[in-house]
C-alpha cells in the first residue's frame, strides 16, 4: 500500500505524505475533458462527475497510459480547471469510477490492472479524497485487491469510509488510517 498526496500540479504524485497548502489556487480556464478509452453503448463508466453543495462540480476520468485524472468546475467562472493527474499508471482501467461528495469533501474509487480488459481483477485499487479547494488529494493505493465497493462521506464531510470485505477510513484530522 502506498499513500500519496497530489498537490494540484500536473503529473504530481510525490511519495510525500505531508500536507500541501489548501487555499484554492486553481485557474478555471478549461473545458471538461473526457476519458480517451473507447466505450460503446450508454454512459461511459470511465467518466464520473459529482456536484458539491456549493454548486461546484468535480470530474474524474481515465486516460490511457496515464492514469486517473481530475478536474473541478467553478460556477462563478463557468469553467473547469486544467486536467490534474492524481494517480499515474500504465495499467488498464478496471470497472468504473465512483464519486461521492458531501459538505466540501469528495471521495473517489478507481481501479487499475494489467489484464482488466481480459476480465482479470484490479491490481491497484484507488481510494482518493479531496477537500475544500480540491487542489490536494489524499490517495491510498491497495495492491492486488478486488476494489472498493462503496465510499460513504459523513454528513459533515469530516470522515470517509471505503468498504468491501474490509474497511479503510479517512479523516480530515489524520488522513488515511494506517493498515
What annotation goes with each model-predicted range?
Residues 1-11:
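Secretory targeting and sorting signals
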Residues 11-89:
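Extracytoplasmic low-complexity, Pro/Thr/Ser/Ala/Gly-rich segments
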Residues 36-51, 90-100, 141-155:
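Repeated scaffold domains used in trafficking and secretory/extracellular systems
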Residues 42, 134-179:
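Acidic, small-residue rich beta-repeat scaffolds with periodic aromatic anchors
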Residues 53-59, 103-109, 155-162:
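Entry beta-strands of beta-propeller and related beta-repeat scaffolds
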Residues 62-67, 113-118, 166-170:
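Short glycine/acidic-enriched loop and turn motifs that connect beta-strands
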Residues 70-75, 121-134:
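Beta-propeller blade signature
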Residues 81-113:
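Blade-loop segments of beta-propeller domains
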Amino acid at each position: 500500500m502506498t499513500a500519496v498526496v497530489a498537490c494540484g500540479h500536473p503529473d504530481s504524485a510525490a511519495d510525500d505524505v505531508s500536507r500541501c497548502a489548501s487555499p484554492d489556487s486553481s485557474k478555471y480556464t478549461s473545458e471538461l475533458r473526457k476519458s480517451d478509452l473507447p466505450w460503446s453503448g450508454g454512459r461511459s463508466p470511465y467518466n464520473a462527475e459529482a456536484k458539491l453543495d456549493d454548486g461546484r462540480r468535480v470530474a474524474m476520468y481515465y486516460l490511457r497510459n496515464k492514469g486517473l485524472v481530475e478536474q473541478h468546475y467553478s460556477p462563478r467562472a463557468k469553467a473547469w480547471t486544467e486536467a490534474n493527474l492524481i494517480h499515474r499508471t500504465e495499467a488498464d482501467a478496471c470497472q468504473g469510477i465512483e464519486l461521492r461528495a458531501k459538505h466540501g469533501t469528495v471521495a473517489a474509487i478507481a481501479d487499475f490492472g494489467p489484464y482488466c480488459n481480459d476480465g482479470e481483477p484490479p491490481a491497484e485499487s484507488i481510494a482518493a479524497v479531496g477537500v475544500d479547494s480540491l487542489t490536494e488529494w489524499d490517495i491510498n493505493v491497495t495492491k492486488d485487491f478486488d476494489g472498493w465497493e462503496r465510499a460513504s462521506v459523513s454528513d459533515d464531510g469530516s470522515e470517509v469510509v471505503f468498504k468491501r470485505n474490509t474497511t479503510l477510513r479517512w479523516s480530515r484530522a489524520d488522513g488515511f488510517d494506517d493498515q
